[in-house]
Amino acid sequence: MHTDLGPDQKAEVLIEALPWLEEFFGKTIVIKYGGNAMVNDHLKECFAEDMVFLRQVGIHPVVVHGGGPQISQMLKALGIHSEFKGGLRVTTPEAMDVVRMVLTGKVSRELVGLINAHGPLAVGLSGEDAALFSASQRKPIIDGEPTDIGLVGDVVGVDASAVVDLIHAGRIPVVSSVAPNEDDATEVLNVNADSAAAALASALGAHKLVILTDVDGLYADWPDKNSLVGRIGVEDLRDLLPELESGMRPKMEACVRAIDGGVQQAHIIDGRKPHSILNEIFTTAGVGTMVEPGEGMELRSSYDL
């Protein structure tokens, strides 16, 4: 790997990471893998390296992923019509078969393979395995009316025992975001990966939830680039939620859910930047937006970087 850093600068980078390596040793961190990091080959490899790094320094990474772009691509290739209502994919039984196939048979397998190129570490499983997730079918309010969007649900229950077993065995769990219907375990629902990651982080008692996005973080006053938030208390974030763009809102709602569920910190970071996870976790300034219990907000423009 090419770097322009001299020996002294390399040493400074390592020393800066030392207190964070000590603080997070033995802790569980749930990472929601998504956005451009899932479709760019170089970023995929960087993500896999980050997961291996975390594991090798004594941290327990757990990955939860979706696969919206890959699902859309496969539906199109198979000639299956797919529509969205209120920003949510209408998931017919035919489309659900494709969702399961892509998430568990393609996205998961690829990521497991990239991680396992560094050693026999990753194990893929879905929300169906060992009843990891259970979900209730969702009928969102769209244009003031409850709307049927098919086999789409919200995670309402987590049995994390299978994931805990993998962590204790030194593995890196890679979890696909599908879940059996709580009312009919033979029916499988498509669930939002952000909220699934938050639910799993809470159930595991994780120290952190990290969500990869295609933006730098949360902006308090979008599109003002100087309003990028470095740290925000969950109470202030709650007040901001109604004002957020539709794409960012579910991610920030997941952060709120995680903090409310006992997770100490939740992060929104830019997955388009190589190794952004390591930069957020192991540097003092970080690179994205961190959500914590309590109140208050700091903009990154106020940091002495």
UniProtKB/Swiss-Prot annotation:
CDD domains: AAK_NAGK-C (cd04250). GO terms for cellular component: cytoplasm. Pathway: Amino-acid biosynthesis; L-arginine biosynthesis; N(2)-acetyl-L-ornithine from L-glutamate: step 2/4. It is an enzyme of class 2 (transferase). It comes from the Bacteria. Gene3D superfamilies: Acetylglutamate kinase-like. Substrate binds at residues 67-68, 89, 190. InterPro entries: AceGlu_kinase-like_sf, AcgluKinase_fam, ArgB, Asp/Glu/Uridylate_kinase, Glu/AcGlu_kinase, NAGK-C. It is found in: Cytoplasm. Catalyzes the ATP-dependent phosphorylation of N-acetyl-L-glutamate. This is Acetylglutamate kinase. It comes from Bifidobacterium animalis subsp. lactis (strain AD011).
